[in-house]
Amino acid sequence: MIMAEKTENSTGRRPETDEITMSHVRDMSLAESGRMKIRWVQDFMPALVAIRARFEREKPFAGKKITISIHMEAKTAFLALCLAAGGAEVHATGCNPLSTQDDVAAGLASMGVETYAM
């Protein structure tokens, strides 16, 4: 049995308000690596970029709270950002510790999405 290393609860900040989020991720020092992976998705997945642009214009989720339990990796993190761009208050949690990428979780938290991925 593999035991998880001791972790620290870390916080991110919402970029638009500098408000502290309640995110809990394994290691916030990995955030830059996670943001790089999420930016890769933005560069190479034009369909999601188009969806985000539409959501930014129309704000279909304004005033809504959306919680997603997902395999925490770059493509699904970008999906969470798309929902946030649509006006939603997004909370994301990893659904499987074996598929959760700690750097992506930290990157997502640093980009203002409440992220729970220990």
Predicted regions and their residues:
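Metallocofactor- and cofactor-centric catalytic cores in central/energy metabolism, strongly enriched
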Residues: 4-118
